[in-house]
Curated annotation (Swiss-Prot):
Family recorded in the similarity comment: Belongs to the peptidase S8 family.
Every Peptidase S8 domain range: 155-461
Protein name: Proprotein convertase subtilisin/kexin type 9
GO biological process, one term: cholesterol metabolic process
GO cellular component terms listed in the entry, alphabetical order: cell surface; cytoplasm; early endosome; endoplasmic reticulum; extracellular space; Golgi apparatus; late endosome; lysosome
Domain of life according to the entry: Eukaryota
Native source organism of the sequence: Pan troglodytes (Chimpanzee)
Signal peptide: 1-30
Amino acid sequence: MGTVSSRRSWWPLPLLLLLLLLLGPAGARAQEDEDGDYEELVLALRSEEDGLAEAPEHGTTATFHRCAKDPWRLPGTYVVVLKEETHLSQSERTARRLQAQAARRGYLTKILHVFHGLLPGFLVKMSGDLLELALKLPHVDYIEEDSSVFAQSIPWNLERITPPRYRADEYQPPDGGSLVEVYLLDTSIQSDHREIEGRVMVTDFENVPEEDGTRFHRQASKCDSHGTHLAGVVSGRDAGVAKGASMRSLRVLNCQGKGTVSGTLIGLEFIRKSQLVQPVGPLVVLLPLAGGYSRVLNAACQRLARAGVVLVTAAGNFRDDACLYSPASAPEVITVGATNAQDQPVTLGTLGTNFGRCVDLFAPGEDIIGASSDCSTCFVSQSGTSQAAAHVAGIAAMMLSAEPELTLAELRQRLIHFSAKDVINEAWFPEDQRVLTPNLVAALPPSTHGAGWQLFCRTVWSAHSGPTRMATAVARCAPDEELLSCSSFSRSGKRRGERMEAQGGKLVCRAHNAFGGEGVYAIARCCLLPQANCSIHTAPPAEAGMGTRVHCHQQGHVLTGCSSHWEVEDLGTHKPPMLRPRGQPNQCVGHREASIHASCCRAPGLECKVKEHGIPAPQEQVTVACEEGWTLTGCSALPGTSHVLGAYAVDNTCVVRSRDVSTAGSTSEEAVAAVAICCRSRHLAQASQELQ
């Protein structure tokens, strides 16, 4: 674009307005239908657009995203996310350029908010007709249509989270959470309720949509109900979990319990700015809400988590896969499902708690007694995954107050480690989700003393791959965790194995589907191993008639896991690596057609051993567990037959699954064994004993 000539005549502003309406009546009318209260009208003055001109970025394509739940969409409002290194001044220029180019085409726009501090971008109100234009602007990474989020709520709970050896009335927690501040993003709060008076500071932050319906009556007790109850569950004097924790409330949900993705984003940005201006001790953010899957909301949660903030969220009350919702699907967030007094999944009418691989653990979420906004001394019972998330936020506050230096990865591993295990009736979940859903109910630790001297591991499942022949699935550990082993699982049994590989400077677990397969899962075993030095050793397929072998040849390195994969088709028949525990325990042995991979690690005092359990006749499931004091790091099957569906770790147990033997046509020679690699750290154990 050239500069404006000094001889150019400028038209009067009223005439420009009239011309604009005549040239673009459809766009202007559509935008007025969505919001008739625009505060600013931007005209495409040629000189302004010339000043904003920037060279477009080549080789990059911005993408558009919107909520998969049509009733929750909010067309006309968009979050424009810019590339990571974009400065605030560039964000503002990009927003002005969008306004100028839109006005030139006859459309009105309004910049509602410019993000900085958490992620670069801006929130804009505009016609959907402008999306193509906006996607071509410099610095734009992606655009997401705004959508709705909802509150997830429709004294047995304190008893349930108390360690088994104690009664709730005699249990003294290691810390009441006094060093931790909990941010609550919810409705407004009745801060003078006796349960939370003096414990909750109501901030001046508010970003909520108008209530649906012109006759909606805003009763104070109704507007404060959800937030007041959850604040009481987290830190209430009588019914709270972390009675010493302080709280700050941000209002992002209206009186109907409804908010927006953009409002939640601005709330998270508010927390990040507060953290930068006035750094305090450990922070926990409670997000007792859920909306459709949102890339931008998950990205914001990731940024905040990597800044040291612990985020806890509700899994959702839709009796559905939690991975379809945000922020529940964000890997950096601790996602909580709900159980009842019998430790069974909560049913809410025709719906109920969400489930699946994106859930980290469950917690009490049915008929929870807490503060009521009806009066300053009233109590009420509420149910939902919001209440479950509030319990875990309280437990997290207590753990962080006792050990303020805990990272998110360390906190998550402790929450999983101290949970009650295998108490949920898995039959409640859909069949294809049972193996993916953790059978864990949150509990307070009996003591934080000595917890730091244990080897903690957890199992992370990937999303299901596609059914195509070359489809793969990838499972990743958190940045502070070590990937110690990799396995795969296919319900059809048709897979080409798995392997660990470097991606972005971090090891990941990749599983391979096979011809005729229905898809595959990758399963990572993610552990906390301080000062670890880990590497992968690979042996290519061997010559005919020979087995493939690989071992840990570096001094001081021990075997933590074995995996294998086929580069060529073997009709979908995966034959996993065979561990030989006798003679050379640091060795993986496999079939000659496969590449074999050994995960070898060195860490202070680390020692590992192989444990095998086989059954002479074929079984649908074979297990082997590590003894107390040892932690499962690797899990595989021996030998590999066409009937093996895969191997995976459940807590400290290695599980090998096979197809139904009654229909698989198996023979007695095809017995399957589960092989576990169990590790511990002598260095950590000795340090723990010295402290006791």
